[in-house]
Amino acid sequence: MYQARPRRRVQAPLILLPVLLLAAACGMPNRVRSMFGGQLPIQVTISPDANENSPLAVELIVVYEDKIVDKLLEKKAREWFSGREQFLRDYADDVDSWKWEWIPGQEIQPLELSYGMGAKRVVLFADYVTPGEHRAAIDPQKPFRLVLGQSEIALEEVR
């Protein structure tokens, strides 16, 4: 004799999936986005007198391991740029990296970078000719404006 079995177990995930997708799309806490990866919107402003009126290399690194975040936050920009190739080879599976070179006063269209699941931190380095750390860090879930001033780098959260 055949007995119908309740389908609650199948229905619950099917009902839950659209709810989770809707919640993620509507701005569920930013940490959820980090768990699954996402898009990182970035605005860039470059001062007309940035870097003593010389082109400025900038690198953005999305980091997926806390120990690597700590290593990067110990580095000054000059150290980063001189050893970046080896660092990226050593930690190829634990970071994503984007590099640009901009000129003072250049207008940059808004950027949107894709990052993977489990991103811990975004670290940026700017290769100014003047001495200094020239490093900044922010959560990957927070849209931001990168401000490249005359002799320093700054990040501003964008709401």
How would you label these PLM feature ranges?
Residues 2-15:
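Bacterial N-terminal signal peptides that target proteins for export
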Residues 23-25:
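C-terminal motif of bacterial Sec signal peptides marking the signal peptidase cleavage site
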Residues 33, 121, 130-159:
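Glycine-rich, aromatic-bearing surface loops/beta-hairpins
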Residues 74-115:
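Tryptophan-paired
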